[in-house]
């Protein structure tokens, strides 16, 4: 026996249903589409969100909010994530190398969440909340200004 000889056992698989192939199939003649009208025609679909001429929901509701472009190049880092950085100096580039932040990020702020495992020096261009700054300094770390 070879792979090209394999076939399912007779009766184990049902045949694909083919509408419009005779009365006996249960879906002959109109093929389950009913008589006349837009949806009976080929290509007769309506656009998503179309409500038959009534003002669609997405146009009835007001616009709101916006997407901040600042969010694209800024990131928040937890204290516990500083342990992933190799070396004693934490910079934006070292955070990128450790896959803590995205490569597009340009500004970083450290948040008070988790524990500081070791004393680290925080490089220029990295901000920190008051609590995070106090926790880093309590662990023996310092900030380069």
UniProtKB/Swiss-Prot annotation:
Regions of compositional bias (Gly residues) in chain numbering: 21-31
Origin: domain of life: Bacteria
A GO molecular function held by the record: structural constituent of ribosome
SUPFAM superfamilies: Ribosomal proteins L15p and L18e (SSF52080)
Family: Belongs to the universal ribosomal protein uL15 family.
GO BP annotations, alphabetical order: translation
HAMAP family registered for this protein in UniProt: Ribosomal_uL15 (MF_01341)
Keyword list, A-Z: Ribonucleoprotein, Ribosomal protein, RNA-binding, rRNA-binding
Function: Binds to the 23S rRNA.
One Pfam short name: Ribosomal_L27A
Assembly information from the UniProt record: Part of the 50S ribosomal subunit.
Protein name as annotated: Large ribosomal subunit protein uL15
Chain positions covered by the region annotation Disordered: 1-57
Organism: Pseudomonas fluorescens (strain Pf0-1)
GO cellular component, one term: cytosolic large ribosomal subunit
